[in-house]
Regions:
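Bacterial N-terminal signal peptides that target proteins for export
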Residues: 1-9
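Bacterial N-terminal signal peptides
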Residues: 8-17
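Sec/Tat signal peptide C-region and signal peptidase I cleavage site
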Residues: 18-23
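Short, low-complexity N-terminal intrinsically disordered segments enriched in polar/charged residues
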Residues: 24-31
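Short, contiguous alpha-helical
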Residues: 31-35, 39-42, 52-97, 139-181
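Well-ordered alpha-helical scaffold segments within catalytic/enzyme domains
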Residues: 40, 44-45, 79, 121, ...
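Acidic/histidine-rich alpha-helical segments that form the ligand environment
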Residues: 99-138, 146-157
Length: 181
């Protein structure tokens, strides 16, 4: 009888705690990979010389600097929506870029600190997320997603544009940093 009672309690305990454990492991994985993607993206951004931040493969493409600003702007917004934390203010040079609908050039001097601040903010945002926040639907009607979906969507958005940035580097004859995961 004692063994049956102990088994019943053990099964009940596991059933009650497993979803939380699963959500924590998802959150831990998100935190780990957001940190890595931030470090890798910053390394890619740093590999481009300052005098080539206005380089674009063709006139329709964003310049390298605009691409870095786009990554940071999108990520800071997504991490704020996902976590509920207040997004940091844009530095003046990046606010100017945003007001120009992304048409103004962005220097390495302006882009690098913003990228670093963005990934610091996203690291804090992911760590601050509760299991409930990961499952809460947030955002404008056209982009109603759970906190998890916001983080995952913009993690992949970062990878997409970082891949573009690596092509820009290669077109300039620069070997991109080795892949990190």
């Amino acid at each position: 009888m004692k063994r049956q009672l102990a088994t019943t309690f053990a099964v009940a305990f596991l059933a009650a705690t497993t979803p939380g454990l699963a959500q924590n492991s998802v959150k831990d994985a998100l935190a780990k990979h957001w940190k890595t993607t931030g470090e890798f993206t910053i390394a890619v951004a740093d590999a481009m010389p300052a005098d080539s931040y206005n380089f674009r493969p063709n006139p329709e493409e964003m310049s390298f600097g605009q691409l870095m600003a786009h990554i940071a702007m999108a990520d800071v917004g997504a991490c704020a929506v996902a976590s509920g934390l207040t997004r940091p203010e844009l530095p003046p040079k990046l606010a100017e870029w945003a007001k120009s609908s992304g048409k103004a050039e962005v220097s390495k001097e302006a882009a690098m600190p913003f990228l670093k601040d963005t990934f610091d903010f996203c690291d804090k945002a992911v760590v601050a997320m509760t299991p409930e926040r990961l499952d809460t639907v947030e955002g404008p009607p056209a982009r109603n997603m759970t906190g998890f979906e916001w983080l995952w969507a913009y993690f992949t958005h970062t990878a997409h544009h970082r891949g573009q940035a690596e092509v820009y580097l290669r077109l300039k004859g620069i070997k991109p940093p080795d892949y990190r995961f």
